[in-house]
Amino acid sequence: MSTTENAAIEPVTGADAEVLLAQPRGFCAGVDRAIEIVERALQRFGAPIYVRHEIVHNAYVVSDLRSKGAVFVQELDDVPVGGTVIFSAHGVSRAVRQAAEARGLRVFDATCPLVTKVHVEVSKMRTQGFEIIMIGHKGHPEVEGTMGQADDGMLLVESVDDVARLAVKDPARLAYVTQTTLSVDETQEIVAAIKARFPAVHEPKKQDICYATQNRQDAVKFMAPQVEVVIVVGSPNSSNSNRLRELAEKLGVPAYMVDTPEQVRPEWLAGKRRVGLTAGASAPEELAQSIVDRLRALGARSVRPLDGIQENMSFPLPRGLQIN
């Protein structure tokens, strides 16, 4: 439905709102795999199982796994010598891997395979002598892990302005990689700025932003013109969830991110005829459905899934956790 058609229909109270569900939404294959790794490790070895950082950036998921015996730590020093530790889906630096080995820890790596792909790119290109621009958010665990695949020669940029300030050693030996959960549109702008300033820059064979990030952003682009407010299910520290909220706002639709049903405020629905709902790649469908239940309790009259891509991606578990 076009925005013109939307404008022609008189808005009614929130009690008559229709909820449109973006497709796809919620868990991606990398998140599914990471959570299953923790659950399988708990089943096989028993609690406690230590996890370095949040396995994925979702408070609901972390709380659930903690209740089952997972212990989330910030540093490997918090893991007993000889204990079992799981690396989060965001990946870790080479230094963290070496520290785990030095402490004699049993390690299961829940790094998303699409993040590992970027790690391999970095290691290969540094070996070939390329200086590498990393497009990403400073301080994000994925960025720290990816930049930590090399001892030096990594340059972080977060914006087009950062590109203008870059000082590189040899423009002819320059490459770039990206964080997997960025805004597709903003990343394209940064890449364009890099290419304009460094025409010889070496590109990844395939874009580093993952399929799930792309698909969920495309789903919001499809949904936004049909609704008057967007609710994103996701935790504040979830990069991909934040990008969904920002995207809806850039498309001119008020957007809110929630972590629990109680955070949905009745006034968001006031006078709204259609409410859009999506969920970040680290948000479980059961949490999204609890938000739908909250919207129904506030008077939403119907829920309608939108058309969209059906994802069927899956990744194998690490050796030692696979079912024989």
Swiss-Prot record:
| Pathway named in the protein's UniProt entry | Isoprenoid biosynthesis; dimethylallyl diphosphate biosynthesis; dimethylallyl diphosphate from (2E)-4-hydroxy-3-methylbutenyl diphosphate: step 1/1; Isoprenoid biosynthesis; isopentenyl diphosphate biosynthesis via DXP pathway; isopentenyl diphosphate from 1-deoxy-D-xylulose 5-phosphate: step 6/6
The record lists [4Fe-4S] cluster as bound by 28, 112, 210
InterPro entries recorded: LytB/IspH
* Record-linked Pfam families: LYTB
Keyword vocabulary terms for this entry: 4Fe-4S, Iron, Iron-sulfur, Isoprene biosynthesis, Metal-binding, Oxidoreductase
Where do the annotations place dimethylallyl diphosphate binding?
57, 90, 140, 238-240, 282
- Cofactor(s) required for function per UniProt: [4Fe-4S] cluster
How the cofactor is bound: the record states: Binds 1 [4Fe-4S] cluster per subunit.
Q: Which reaction does it catalyse?
A: isopentenyl diphosphate + 2 oxidized [2Fe-2S]-[ferredoxin] + H2O = (2E)-4-hydroxy-3-methylbut-2-enyl diphosphate + 2 reduced [2Fe-2S]-[ferredoxin] + 2 H(+); dimethylallyl diphosphate + 2 oxidized [2Fe-2S]-[ferredoxin] + H2O = (2E)-4-hydroxy-3-methylbut-2-enyl diphosphate + 2 reduced [2Fe-2S]-[ferredoxin] + 2 H(+)
Q: Which residues bind (2E)-4-hydroxy-3-methylbut-2-enyl diphosphate?
A: 57, 90, 140, 180, 238-240, 282
* Alphabetical GO biological process terms: dimethylallyl diphosphate biosynthetic process; isopentenyl diphosphate biosynthetic process, methylerythritol 4-phosphate pathway; terpenoid biosynthetic process
**Class of this enzyme:** oxidoreductase
Coiled-coil stretches: none
Specify which residues bind isopentenyl diphosphate according to the UniProt entry for this protein: 57, 90, 140, 238-240, 282
- Record EC number: 1.17.7.4
A molecular-function term among this protein's GO annotations? 4 iron, 4 sulfur cluster binding
**Catalytic center at which residues?**
142
Q: Which family does it belong to?
A: Belongs to the IspH family.
User: What is the protein's known function?
Assistant: Catalyzes the conversion of 1-hydroxy-2-methyl-2-(E)-butenyl 4-diphosphate (HMBPP) into a mixture of isopentenyl diphosphate (IPP) and dimethylallyl diphosphate (DMAPP). Acts in the terminal step of the DOXP/MEP pathway for isoprenoid precursor biosynthesis.
Any idea what this protein is called?
Answer: 4-hydroxy-3-methylbut-2-enyl diphosphate reductase
Organism of origin is: Ralstonia nicotianae (strain ATCC BAA-1114 / GMI1000)
